[in-house]
Each structure stands twice: as structure tokens, then as C-alpha cells.
A protein has these predicted regions:
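N-terminal Rossmann NAD(P)H-binding glycine-rich loop of SDR-like oxidoreductase domains
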Residues: 3-23
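N-terminal Rossmann-fold cofactor-binding loop
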Residues: 30-35
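Glycine-rich NAD(P)-binding loop of the Rossmann-fold in SDR/ketoreductase-type enzymes
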Residues: 138-146, 183, 187-188, 249
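NAD(P)-dependent short-chain dehydrogenase/reductase
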Residues: 184, 194-246, 251-255, 259-260, ...
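Conserved Rossmann-fold NAD(P)-dependent oxidoreductase catalytic core, especially the SDR/UDP-sugar
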Residues: 121-123, 127, 148-184, 206
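Conserved catalytic-core motifs of eukaryotic protein kinase domains, centered on the activation segment
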Residues: 131-138, 173-177, 219
């Protein structure tokens, strides 16, 4: 199967791409022409990276709307979609072909992209995912418009299955069934989710509600990595209350889950929402305490000194923009389809301690 991934250099994009390659799929990833993150994929054999600005799909959508109303409109506007569109608009022609078996990076035009005839698209690209960005209305509105244009492009070019990387933010104060998003980020992600479920036509639309994924590739200031580093250093960690239901899933299991869903035969449902999570949800504070205890055991095993007294300081940090709400995951959906997790929370955290200790200490 030929698969296109937007946001390929993200933590989740990389995890998914690796899992799909292992299953024998052809994997193409979209990244910004100026991306500084493509080094994350260095050495990934078989992955093909395509330099393309996601805003290009907005231009494609605009051109197609014009063509529907006026004859020869692209000629009148001075736009030639078969040749190079200026790099200011975010597209360059194909070049830099290579026979390197590692990740291939080349620029591509939209017509050339269409000729690759993708079977599935996994859409991770979404700006403003940090706390400040989630509150930025303009950024989140732009994300929504670009996502709709990308969706329309995929639908128009025969893509069979479109995956959207949603999150808990769409639920906010509510639930998956009755969402009440608490931020512009959650509102716009929910808006695209609903748009895809309504307008997918013959293209299958899988609305992924992704819970907290942890692992080696997670961003450096994530809660889990911060806890691991602080435990190794014997430093205190200031935290929120931790009194909310949470769910953690290992990055290896996440990638495998997406590869599983990509291969899944869908008999009766052309579009549906599914939670991507582990089989267990519990209080966030319980997870946090377990991470610290695993760290103490790790330090003892290494023969390193530690006090044994908890360095967790709950109740000192305010909630983020999403608020301090329970996120109750549908923990049985993936297993009901036949997916099996391989990494327990304890073993995943032990591996992360080993990785961070070996690479940073």
C-alpha cells in the first residue's frame, strides 16, 4: 500500500512511518521545504520525504473553485499548475533524485504528488500544539482551512482512506459523545473531525482521538521525560493536582496501532471515530508516582545514590489551556478490532530511563 503522511517529522508521524515501513508499505512523508526537523528521520531506510508547504493545498482548492466558475481561469490568473509554482507559494518541482536507500528528500509539485496515487493518507500536520499556540485563534483557524483543503485534495485524487490525528482536546469539559472543547485548538480539531465524518463520500475517514503517547521520540519538555530526568538528577518536579483520569500509551504501540488500522478491512463503516489509547486509564497522579518509583528502582539497580523520598510536588502548577478535566478513554475499542498492545507502562518507562541515562548522563 502506498501511504502519504503529513507532519512526518512529528513524534507521532515518525512512529507511524516506521511501523508502516516494517509492515512493507511504501511511505511518503510531507515536510516543509525549510524544515529543520528532517534530521530526525536520518537513516530511516525506505522513507521518502517530499518538500511541500501544506498551504499549497489551499492554493489548489482556490484554483479548483475558480475553475468551477470560469473557463480557462488559471490562464487568466497567470497560474500554470503543471509547472513550478513559486517557492513563495510553497511548491517546487521535483529534483534531487537519488538512489540512496535511506530517507530520500526531494521537492515535489502537486500534479506530481497526485500521480503517485496514494491508497491512504495520515494527517498529522497541525501548527500551534503548545500551550500558547492552542489559544491562538488565527493559527487554529488556518489549521482548519488547510486540513479541509488537504482532505478535499485527497478525496479528489482517489485516496481510499484518510486518517485524522485528533486528540483529547476535542472533548474538553465534555465527552466524545457530547464534546465541549475548552480551547481554539480543541474547537478547530473538532470542527475538522465533524467535517470529515460528514463529507468523506466514498473515501473512508478514520477520526483518531489520540491520548497521551510517551517514548524516546517525545518532545523534550513532556511530562514523562521531565519526570524521568528530574528523578535521575534528584530534583523536585512541580506538578498540577494530578486528580484527573488519564491514559498513557507507548510510542511503539501507537505506531503499531496506526499500522494495524491502515491494514484493517472495514466492512460496514465508511467513517468512524476511535480512541487511540492503552487498555488502562487511571488517575494521572498514580501514573506520576509510578514513574518516580520505577526511577528509584532504576537508580538502585545502577548502584547510584538516591534519597528514596518523593520529590513530587503536587498542586503547584495551574492547569494548561485545556483545563483540568477527566479524559475518559474508550479503552476497549482497539482490542475489540483485534489489536494487541505489546508494551506495558512499567516496561516502557524502564526503557525510557535506560535511554535517557545512557544518552544524557
Amino acid at each position: 500500500m502506498r501511504v502519504l503522511i503529513s507532519g512526518i517529522t512529528s513524534f507521532l508521524g515518525i512512529s507511524t512511518g516506521k511501523a508502516l515501513l516494517k509492515k512493507g508499505h511504501e511511505v511518503y512523508g510531507i515536510l516543509r521545504p525549510e524544515s529543520r526537523n528532517k534530521e530526525r528521520l536520518k537513516g530511516e531506510k525506505g522513507m521518502q520525504l517530499l518538500s511541500l508547504n501544506m498551504e499549497s493545498f489551499l492554493l489548489w482548492e482556490k484554483e479548483n473553485e475558480i475553475e468551477a466558475e470560469y473557463t480557462n481561469s488559471t490562464t487568466e490568473a497567470g497560474i500554470n499548475t503543471e509547472r513550478c509554482i513559486t517557492t513563495e507559494r510553497g511548491i517546487t518541482t521535483e529534483n534531487n533524485s537519488t538512489t540512496d536507500s535511506h530517507a530520500i528528500d526531494k521537492s515535489i509539485s502537486l500534479p506530481s504528488l497526485a500521480r503517485l496515487h496514494f491508497d491512504a493518507v495520515l494527517h498529522f500536520a497541525w501548527d500551534g500544539v503548545g500551550s500558547l499556540g492552542r489559544s491562538d485563534i488565527a493559527t487554529q483557524e488556518k489549521n482548519l482551512r488547510m486540513s479541509k483543503a488537504f482532505f478535499s485534495w485527497a478525496k479528489a485524487h482517489g485516496v481510499k482512506r484518510f486518517f485524522f490525528a485528533g486528540s483529547q482536546a476535542e472533548m474538553g469539559k465534555g465527552s466524545r459523545e457530547e464534546p465541549l472543547p475548552a480551547s481554539p485548538y480543541g474547537e478547530k480539531k473538532l470542527a475538522f473531525s465533524e467535517y470529515g465524518l460528514r463529507n468523506h463520500g466514498k473515501m473512508e475517514f478514520i477520526d483518531l482521538r489520540i491520548y497521551s503517547i510517551y517514548g524516546k521520540g517525545d518532545h523534550e519538555r513532556s511530562l514523562v521525560k521531565t519526570l524521568v530526568r528530574n528523578t535521575l538528577r534528584g530534583m523536585e518536579t512541580e506538578l498540577g493536582s494530578g486528580n484527573k483520569i488519564w491514559n498513557f500509551m507507548a510510542e511503539e504501540d501507537f505506531g503499531q496501532a496506526l499500522a494495524f488500522l491502515t491494514d484493517l478491512e472495514i466492512q460496514t463503516r465508511g467513517a468512524f471515530t476511535i480512541d487511540i489509547c492503552s487498555g488502562e486509564s487511571r488517575l494521572l497522579s498514580d501514573y506520576i508516582k509510578e514513574i518516580e518509583q520505577i526511577g528509584f528502582s532504576f537508580l538502585k539497580k545502577k548502584g547510584l545514590r538516591y534519597s528514596g523520598e518523593s520529590l513530587l510536588r503536587f498542586g503547584l502548577r495551574p492547569p494548561n489551556v485545556e483545563g483540568d478535566y477527566d479524559f475518559t478513554a474508550h479503552t476497549k475499542e482497539l482490542s475489540a478490532l483485534g489489536f494487541e498492545e505489546r508494551v506495558s507502562f512499567s516496561s516502557g518507562i524502564e526503557e525510557l530511563y535506560e535511554f535517557i541515562y545512557e544518552t544524557e548522563f
